[in-house]
């Protein structure tokens, strides 16, 4: 895998073109429906998008609507081993994280994205959901660590489907209300590990609430 350049946040003109191509395809293949788009913050708001991890197309599902800004997605490093996949994902603003290794480069890059006025997206669970019903799983600390470091709010988003997502199934993407650092308990000068874990849990609870409202 070619070494990812964490030193600068890129801008690619191909992003909007790729987004425009994929939007009608996913609407047709997955009968996709969107809810809560009014909750997507206005430009200039500092926030992170947190999404349950259902399948490889999660970034496309969530970023497709017109009022959703470019999302810089944290994705597992293994996906970047294929040169074409790496080229494509980089131009969709994905960046690699080495899972389970305390990848500080990816965390620092996530903070850079937010502090430079862009929007980062992350799947708090850290891996794809294995449950056959698609039930969201427990969050890891990463999303709360980055939110604390950048004083960013968090937009919970749930990708909802009865069972595993596949062609022909109905998918709903539900955008929740923005969670502020104060609501998450991350506005303290110093946060303990418990504070971070509680904030990550609260974010995941909100995602699960959105999911349950559509699936159950």
What residue ranges belong to the model's regions?
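Non-catalytic C-terminal accessory region of glycerolipid acyltransferases
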Residues: 1-13, 107-216
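A transmembrane-helix-recognition feature enriched in membrane-embedded lipid enzymes
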Residues: 2-36, 83-92
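Short, basic, glycine/proline-bearing loop/turn elements
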Residues: 22, 91-98, 126-130
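A generic structural signal for well-ordered alpha-helical segments
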Residues: 25-27, 66, 89, 113, ...
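Short gly/ser/thr-rich secondary-structure transition/capping motifs
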Residues: 28-35, 101-104, 157
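A secondary-structure boundary/capping signal
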Residues: 36, 52, 75-76, 93, ...
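Short amphipathic alpha-helix with an adjacent loop that forms part of the alpha/beta core around
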Residues: 38-42, 111-112
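Catalytic core of membrane glycerolipid acyltransferases/transacylases, capturing the structured
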Residues: 42-101
